[in-house]
UniProtKB/Swiss-Prot annotation:
Belongs to the succinate/malate CoA ligase beta subunit family. It catalyses: succinate + ATP + CoA = succinyl-CoA + ADP + phosphate; GTP + succinate + CoA = succinyl-CoA + GDP + phosphate. It comes from Bacteroides fragilis (strain ATCC 25285 / DSM 2151 / CCUG 4856 / JCM 11019 / LMG 10263 / NCTC 9343 / Onslow / VPI 2553 / EN-2). Heterotetramer of two alpha and two beta subunits. Succinyl-CoA synthetase functions in the citric acid cycle (TCA), coupling the hydrolysis of succinyl-CoA to the synthesis of either ATP or GTP and thus represents the only step of substrate-level phosphorylation in the TCA. The beta subunit provides nucleotide specificity of the enzyme and binds the substrate succinate, while the binding sites for coenzyme A and phosphate are found in the alpha subunit. ATP binds at residues 46, 53-55, 95, 100. Substrate binds at residues 257, 314-316. Its EC number is 6.2.1.5. This is Succinate--CoA ligase [ADP-forming] subunit beta. Pathway: Carbohydrate metabolism; tricarboxylic acid cycle; succinate from succinyl-CoA (ligase route): step 1/1. Mg(2+) binds at residues 192, 206.
Amino acid sequence: MKVHEYQAKEIFSTYGIPVERHALCHTADGAVAAYHRMGVNRVAIKAQVLTGGRGKAGGVKLANNDRDVYQYAQTILEMTIKGYPVTKILLSEAVNIAAEYYISFTIDRNTRSVTLIMSAAGGMDIEEVARQSPEKIIRCSIDPLIGVPDYLAHKFAFSLFEQAEQANRMATIIQDLYKAFIEKDASLAEINPLVLTPVGTLLAIDAKMVFDDNALYRHPDLQKLSEPTEDEKLEAIAKERGFSYVRMDGEIGCMVNGAGLAMTTMDMIKLYGGNPANFLDIGGSSNPVKVIEAMRLLLDDKKVKVVFINIFGGITRCDDVAIGLLQAFEQIQTDIPIIVRLTGTNGNMGRELLRKNNRFQVAQTMEEATKMAIESLKKESI
């Protein structure tokens, strides 16, 4: 689960990580009022959206008077950035910057550990820095039994700072960020940039946190911060019904039993020139109610023009699946072509049952079924 910058900064503040003065606003008038309350000369007006690239999209502006604050706030609040409408903005004190740094804790799948990543090249896309100047990146795996004790925090801090006073402040921030990362079950805690001001203060002027969805039940406070997209709402509904569902951008809706087969189905669709509309694993049940719910989930996506049902009968018998499909489609009214591939236990019986109903196009092999789906899509697109 992602959270907005202002929410991440609130969490950072509770852990003692220094952030600049800021205020959340929902209107241009509110932004001007907040500007007066803050009593600073210059502010950064930043769109609050759960996606990157807001600066390049014009979602971050600097202002130093009422007119500019109002104008920029109004403009940003009317924007949509990568499909996300901007409904709130963050007014942040624009601090003087002597240097910028990058610091984050994340999960490194290669080392199977929490990893600290630091760089003196802050304020930039860290992945771009890693590609172009990998020598500027410092990576350290963290032993979960030790964490980040004082001696390690100071060792890390002195790799970026020579002066003891600044290194001591950095060491404290490293420890506080690690504590927030662990206690909140985060998969990412990032400050980019962490700035050094001319007077020697360190401030997190941008903040990012991502949390493990599977651990949210332990954090009611974080659950309240969730702002799911429409796709995420559908995925949550599917999860409640026992499905694994992820919406995509294609036109061929997939209903499959088993995650591995679902991945293979999507690969086959791509191989033959199509695009899957979703990942949908309905598990091993042939229950008609489950099929109905899965179909309604697919058909809620208006981009779906063809449905590809791919079932491998292992413990689940194909004739039971066929009966479930027939019962389900007595209640589902749709003109969308339905391609069904049934193979495995009692596969012949299952296919024979479905062929008696002209509602389905039936196949035995995945290749045959995929070609049927692509051909049907071409006809629907004419």
